């Protein structure tokens, strides 16, 4: 865990191309262990994305003054590792909604417009009662906190 970490927003990752090669080059450039196997590259990506999500949630909290206790994930919910890593990194419960959350949201808005659903709260209740909602609890917070500090240093110096 945490052997290789990247900044998902790094400029070299923004255009199509050989991403594993670019990740390896980034890790070499930043003095980290270079991931060699597909599994090491995938873990690097998953952990790094989870830290980026934490940075984003904390930034939203700073801007709004609100504290968010739950992270809701729509797309990407099929990747259980990303969901668990996000819970671990953010130190928040991750709640996953339906796979087709965008389409379902559209249906809810249309039902509201037609008067079949009173308001957004009722729409949320309909979704909760109609689809499996899985939650992921944070684990190993101290390890993830230490690795988050390491990640922030890596991306600052990249």
Regions found by a protein language model. Give the residues of each.
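Active-site core segments that coordinate phosphate-bearing ligands/cofactors
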Residues: 1-70, 78-102, 108-158
